[in-house]
């Protein structure tokens, strides 16, 4: 697999950090949006590396892509509409579901790290 260690590290940090930011009801800040944009690029780099790797990694690729796309909806809402928009669309009742996705992501990213 292509060397994407830095993308893995950055994406992992960003997903975990952004979840905590939203869970703790912190206001939107410009740096958050920049991190969000860069994280999506890192996601695509990792996705491409998995696509170019062996066929045996395709189930991992599918799980990774589905999981991150589910997380992306939460981050996108916050990036586009701030905390107020996030709370209006998802509210506190969605935080446990979001957290479960982040925990699943953390496990998947460890599997990808093991390929490096």
Residue ranges and their predicted role:
Residues 1-43:
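Short terminal alpha-helical segments
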Residues 5, 9-12, 16, 62-65, ...:
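Generic detector of well-ordered alpha-helical segments enriched in charged/polar residues
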Residues 12-19, 40-47, 71-83, 109:
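Extended amphipathic alpha-helical scaffold segments
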Residues 20, 37, 51, 57-59, ...:
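Short, flexible coil/linker elements and helix-boundary hinge sites characteristic
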Residues 20-33, 51-58, 80-95:
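Charged, low-complexity interaction regions
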Residues 42-66:
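Short, solvent-exposed, charged loop/turn and helix-capping segments
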Residues 69-116:
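Amphipathic alpha-helical binding modules
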């Amino acid at each position: 697999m292509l060397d994407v260690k830095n993308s893995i590290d950055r994406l992992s940090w960003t997903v975990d950090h952004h979840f905590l930011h939203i869970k703790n009801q912190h206001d939107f800040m410009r740096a958050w949006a920049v991190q969000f944009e860069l994280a999506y690029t890192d996601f695509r780099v990792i996705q491409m590396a998995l696509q170019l790797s062996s066929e045996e990694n395709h189930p991992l690729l599918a799980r990774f892509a589905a999981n991150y796309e589910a997380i992306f909806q939460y981050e996108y809402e916050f990036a586009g509409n701030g905390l107020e928009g996030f709370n209006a669309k998802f509210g506190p009742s969605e935080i446990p579901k979001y957290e479960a996705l982040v925990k699943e992501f953390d496990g998947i990213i460890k599997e990808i790290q093991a390929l490096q």
